[in-house]
């Protein structure tokens, strides 16, 4: 007679054997796809992201002044000069320190550097999988299968991103932590926070855990990274990151905040409740206060369980791994700029959670976990048809991530001893206070932020940035950042014409009224006349023409530092001559009617306003933290932007009396003023309600 128990065990063994066979087959197919499809494509082309890191590291390696690396047009100019085969580059919101990971590769071409980078990533991936295998009870095939099923990992290799490196660091840190090497684990968390800011949430985890060694290690790691960043890049760039880039990134405004393809909580709430004339003309409800309240409230609703479910002062490897997974999952769910490759990091928490479920032999939960994991990798968001409340249907990845967090929290609750299932009053109060402060900060940030819309000039939908306006009678000339590069543009009564598509970028424009000049950028910058048979000026940037049309001033750069040079338009055979000393790094300039130049230049560590006459006599004007000078045609007024609290606002200086007063008072950037011919109206670039420095043009009458 057949033994029912033996028969059942036999069936179970056969089922497990078939599962193993299927796993090996799937792993082999996925690895074959990676080797035959993904890796060759990554090897042949630069794609979008690797050039950002490579260019910054190379400029630093070659001793350039990199204090302006976050300025889109400045870094685009450097990219063109180095002939890097990538249409658009930009550093926002990348940390300065993260670019140093490719420092050793900057002696070679960009594509060759990417080859070495890909090889290093393959090695790091194998080491990471070995650490995961060591940390869990999962067999090699399952650890490898988790990685092979990661579509974000494929994208990471295609674009040359650094998330395999970040995955390795966080995995190694977790491996050390569960082995009671808390100080070293904390140092690695500090290192990870230098690459991407969100791992700093582990510091809060360590505080909740009351783990002094891990706290100390994280602080030491962060201080070490800060010291290296200051030593390599200097104070100015790091200050720009901390006071301008990072706050915008935390609000979800480092890049287009209304883009539902990001599928982030921030982009969804921006789309639902914040009106913007060009980027979001049809929100579900124009209620900025709702965004200010709901964003921190919903963020805390996700973060709080991950922290409150932590068991303080207790180190159990099984429990620590789950807590580690929960913290990483919630940081990914709350990311304000979650590109697909970010979710390469899911490999770590998914392996840790799978291991916990495998020990419980909970196959249904494993199936749910892997379904969530696969869905996060292949779905994102859609920006098509997301007007009004329909935006709620356009971010499926966000909902799957939230479900994955809830799934992990339930697992933590299930594994937590009953006597531990009680809220920490002090932590609950602290989280409520943090949420309240965040809401108050948001409401304060919004004061007057959207008033600028009433003065906005029409901007075509395909223009991401309109900048550097120049007034010519009833026409506005400006530079337009579009999908295929930077164009010169002409706006005549809301009819906009763009320069023809070209391999070169157009990064500046100037006008005498009868003549127009543009900066055309390829291997070098050349200021060329438009529709005229005059010769261009090589190695020249950012042209400005005097009121009488006799002089053209331009910048000539050497290793990222620029001087003013003068070119005589009425005597073109005369040699161009420098006007400012090398000790000043000139940023922008404007002519006074009599021919004197007012310019902004970095002296010591901050930009200041100076004047220079035709003989080169320099005079400091006593105005600090100031850029973008512009003189009215009647010579009575100087407009400029001054930095205060991380924002550039417009100021007016009376040239006759010396009096100054602030013209705008908002927590955004109003820059690059240009005067209309009546000397009563300003056209300027504003990023209020938009992504950081992705400006639109506004026209505003100054005097009644």
Where are these regions (language model features)?
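Primarily membrane-embedded glycan-assembly and transfer machineries that use lipid-linked glycans
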Residues: 2-184, 209-340
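A cytosolic-side transmembrane-helix exit/cap motif
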Residues: 163-166, 186-189, 236-243, 344-348, ...
């Amino acid at each position: 007679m057949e033994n029912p128990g033996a028969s059942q065990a036999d069936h179970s063994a056969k089922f497990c054997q078939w599962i193993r066979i299927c796993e090996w087959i799937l792993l082999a197919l996925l690895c074959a796809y990676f080797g035959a499809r993904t890796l060759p494509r990554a090897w042949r082309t630069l794609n979008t992201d690797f050039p950002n890191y490579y260019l910054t590291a190379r400029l630093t390696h070659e001793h350039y002044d990199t204090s302006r690396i976050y300025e889109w047009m400045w870094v685009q100019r450097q990219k063109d000069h180095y002939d890097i085969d990538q249409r658009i580059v930009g550093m926002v919101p990348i940390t300065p320190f993260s670019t140093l990971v490719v420092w050793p590769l900057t002696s070679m071409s960009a594509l060759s550097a990417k080859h070495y980078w890909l090889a290093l990533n393959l090695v790091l991936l194998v080491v990471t999988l070995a650490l995961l295998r060591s940390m869990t009870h999962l067999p090699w095939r399952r650890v490898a299968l988790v990685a092979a099923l990661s579509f974000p990992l494929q994208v990471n290799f295609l674009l040359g991103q650094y998330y395999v490196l970040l995955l390795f660091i966080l995995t190694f840190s977790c491996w050390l932590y569960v082995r009671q090497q808390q100080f070293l684990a904390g140092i690695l968390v500090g290192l990870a926070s230098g690459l991407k800011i969100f791992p700093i949430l582990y510091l809060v985890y360590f505080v909740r855990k009351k783990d002094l060694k891990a706290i100390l290690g994280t602080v030491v790691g962060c201080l070490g990274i800060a010291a290296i960043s200051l030593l390599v890049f200097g104070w100015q760039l790091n200050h720009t990151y901390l006071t301008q880039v990072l706050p915008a990134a935390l609000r979800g405004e480092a890049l287009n905040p209304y883009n539902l393809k990001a599928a982030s909580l921030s982009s969804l709430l921006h789309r639902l409740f914040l009106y913007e004339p060009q980027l979001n003309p049809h929100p579900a409800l124009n209620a900025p206060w709702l965004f200010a309240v709901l964003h921190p409230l919903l963020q805390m609703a996700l973060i709080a369980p991950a922290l409150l479910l932590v068991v303080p002062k207790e180190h159990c490897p099984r429990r620590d791994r789950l807590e580690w997974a929960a913290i990483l999952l919630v940081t990914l769910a709350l990311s304000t700029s979650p590109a697909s490759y970010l979710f390469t990091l899911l490999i770590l928490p998914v392996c840790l959670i799978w291991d916990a479920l495998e020990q419980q032999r909970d196959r249904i939960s494993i199936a749910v976990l892997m379904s969530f994991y696969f869905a996060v990798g292949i779905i994102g968001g859609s920006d098509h048809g997301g007007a009004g409340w329909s935006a709620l249907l356009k971010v499926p990845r966000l909902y799957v991530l939230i479900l994955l967090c809830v799934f992990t929290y339930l697992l933590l609750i299930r594994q937590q001893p009953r006597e531990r299932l009680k809220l920490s009053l002090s932590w609950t109060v602290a989280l409520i206070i943090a949420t309240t402060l965040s809401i108050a900060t948001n409401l304060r940030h919004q004061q007057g932020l959207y008033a600028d819309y009433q003065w906005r000039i029409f901007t075509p939908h395909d223009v991401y940035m309109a900048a550097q306006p120049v007034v010519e009678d009833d026409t506005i000339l400006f530079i337009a950042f579009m999908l295929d590069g930077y164009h010169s543009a002409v706006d005549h009564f809301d009819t906009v014409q763009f320069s023809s598509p070209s391999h070169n970028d157009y990064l500046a424009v100037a006008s005498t009224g009868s003549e127009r000049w543009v900066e055309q950028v390829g291997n070098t910058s050349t200021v060329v006349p438009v529709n005229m048979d005059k010769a261009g000026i090589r190695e020249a940037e950012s042209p400005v023409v005097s009121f009488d049309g006799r002089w053209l001033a331009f910048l000539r750069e050497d290793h990222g530092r620029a001087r003013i040079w003068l070119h005589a338009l009425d005597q073109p055979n005369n040699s161009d001559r420098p006007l400012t000393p090398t000790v000043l790094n000139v940023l922008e300039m404007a002519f006074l009617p009599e021919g004197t130049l007012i310019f902004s230049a970095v002296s010591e560590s901050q930009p200041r306003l100076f004047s220079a006459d035709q003989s080169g006599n320099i005079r400091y004007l006593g105005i600090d933290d100031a850029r973008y000078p512009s003189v009215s045609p009647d010579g009575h007024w100087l407009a400029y932007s001054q930095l205060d609290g991380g924002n550039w606002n417009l100021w007016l200086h009376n040239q006759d009396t010396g009096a100054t007063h602030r013209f705008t008072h908002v927590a955004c950037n109003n820059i690059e003023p240009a005067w209309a011919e009546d000397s009563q109206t300003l056209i300027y670039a504003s990023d209020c309600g938009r992504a950081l420095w992705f400006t639109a043009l506004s026209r505003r009458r100054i005097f009644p």
